[in-house]
Amino acid sequence: MPDVAVIPRPVLLETTDGPPFVLTAATILVVDSAPELVAVGVLAADLLGRLSGRPVEVRYTEGGAPSVVRLRLSEDLPAGDEAYRLVVSEHRVDIDARSAAGLVRAVVTLRQTVSSLGDGTLTVPALRVEDHPRYAWRGLSIDVARHFFTVDDLKAIIGLLAHYKLNVLHLHLTDDQGWRVHLPSRPHLTRASAGTSVGGGPGGFYNPAQLAEIVVARAARGIRVVPEIDVPGHVNAATHAYGDLTPSGEPTDVYTGIEVGFSRLHDDLPATRPFLRDVFTDLAAMTPGEYVHIGGDEVLTMDHDKYARLVGYAASVVRDAGKKVVGWQEISSTPLEPGTVVQYWDINADPAPFVAAAQAGAHVLMSPGSRAYLDMKYDATTELGLEWAGHIELRDAYDWEPSTLIPGVPPESVIGVEAAVWTETLTDLGELTSMLLPRLAAVAEVAWTAPQDRDWDDFSGRVAQHAPFWDRVGFRWHASPQVSWPGPGSAPGAAF
């Protein structure tokens, strides 16, 4: 029997005696008729059909079929929306979950356990999996402002997130180099500032229909979108579009470099607050998720009281729109409403304000630059990426513990883990995935799996078996020297 190389590692995975389940032309997929279950069933049938090369029929009843994959909702599972149970025997696969999202996670596990025999037969070993995530927030932040990535690029990344049971796509939509989302109340933002990027490239933006397409793609895979408009710094794209946001009244020049900290909004200008209300109200209306990210990072030329007033105002607009507020760790130095999500990233900053905010009731999202910033170079020879937080090899992305990373932060305040990839040096999907893989799989396991169940040697063996999948779907990836990767022409194995 081939090794079972599931990532993230489940709470319980045990192989059982008995012959494997064989995916055949007679295999059907059975779900109840609830709309959300039908959507998961169609997704599962599509995944299995892609593996087998033949369609898998979705039905509401088994009807005596000899080979069945059954998806059901069940309360007989640990608490948590994403808990699931997967049981595989010779003639059937039974999947139970507390929610549609849990069924999606189970289908991913099933997909990762499918193996191909030498004659092309697809099998799943007899096994039992009981699983649920450690953290409810497991995400990836993608900077689409420095370089623009198309809807198709993002769909490919959404598929990758789902494959590693990540459930948040955080889109950094604005920065000095470009404004990437069309807002009905401020159409001049994309007219003036969408056509630029780092190095002078063409840029781009998402119109409302395209943003909705991204939202639909992620919803089918149990992933929520957290959109970010970064204020009160990183705003040169905004001040280039609207001169009334500058003291001179004149628009700023286009910026295509990679420096940070030079641009900001002005607390005392009459145009500033209407601008903030317009952009955050529009953004909240365009995305169905609970959260909107207000940025707040790297405002290096602004009086702190003025900074705090603008952060507070932006947060109030987001709350007025019915959303919860997320911001980078710098907002922890301002008055925060309980439940605000503060995202840790800067390993060089004084952690005291961040710790104080967590102790006062803020929720903590862990994205340490030295562990989870996947635009950092792997080593000094890496052609792409930056180095301000050091080099991050695969084991660096794996061997860290979110709950104890910052002394004084209450472990119960940590709601999740989010990797981030900034795109100053990344211009296309291939370059992006070469920095994400294999490190994204490592961060995903940190976010899903309890620390006592994580083991580097075990993980490195499992992740090696994922390389053929990355090759099959066309993802570029980094062959970390810390892993014994399979060579060309390896024996048949994982088919996922």
Curated annotation (Swiss-Prot):
Q: How sensitive is activity to pH?
A: Optimum pH is 7.3-8.7 with 4'-nitrophenyl beta-N-acetyl-D-glucosaminide as substrate. Rapidly inactivated above pH 9.5 and stable from pH 6.0 to 9.5.
**SUPFAM superfamilies this protein is in?**
(Trans)glycosidases, beta-N-acetylhexosaminidase-like domain
A Gene Ontology molecular-function term?
A: beta-N-acetylhexosaminidase activity
Q: Which Pfam families match?
A: Glyco_hydro_20 (PF00728), Glyco_hydro_20b (PF02838)
Q: Which UniProt keywords apply?
A: Carbohydrate metabolism, Chitin degradation, Glycosidase, Hydrolase, Polysaccharide degradation
Hydrolase among keywords: yes
List, alphabetically, the InterPro entries matched: Beta_hexosaminidase_sua/sub, Glyco_hydro_20_cat, Glycoside_hydrolase_SF, Hex-like_dom2, HEX_bac_N
Q: Recite the other comments.
A: The reaction mechanism involves an oxazolinium ion intermediate.
- Tell me which family the UniProt entry assigns to this protein: Belongs to the glycosyl hydrolase 20 family.
What name does UniProt use for this protein? Beta-N-acetylhexosaminidase
Originating gene: hex20
